[in-house]
């Protein structure tokens, strides 16, 4: 399984090193299976070679930005990393909540896609554009250049993608998360009057790092895609997004082997789905108490 994940990730995005680490990192939080290192590395590299051999090409984004780690940029990266964590958590929570709502519907097998499709069509008509549909490649491309993206863009993309996934349409969440991160990074750069290419590159990998709980793989991916000169800010943004996103994520079967905080305690083999369900029960009891008090 880990080797297959590594091969798929490395070949799809043209990042064989990141693919290998992703396969090692994604199944459980806080634990890396080094006994699977060689199979994952070989699988990812071979998958990438095969894809390139049959003529498949990968899109490259222009993040050619001169970079010097000044105190201003240092604190800006920490701040934007926290924003990336918030976007990761919001996306994961919204997606799981909508999945829960969809599955609770009577005749959900039929109603879920009908309702979800109708909502997406209505939102597309309201937006007046199809730019928020699909993977978001056009939005990613625009995020690396001026003018900077509006802060509303990443929120709208979160809503579109969460509804699509939550109501049963499975078109992938990885590239839309790249889009959400890139547009948020671009918006942050516009707000702080900095280079959008730098923060779009950081958001591209950091939001996914927080949502998938794979900071090492996403750091390496950022280096493979955007260059080693951005290694330090990429690593900072990915780690901050990973830590601050909490025990949330897009992969509900992901186990928690080592909590992100010493203050958090979980039973053995606890998954993110179990954490979400426990959090939801606590929230429901709290709302019930407040309702009874009022």
What are these regions (language model features)?
Residues 1-294:
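Alpha-helical transmembrane segments and immediately membrane-proximal extracytoplasmic
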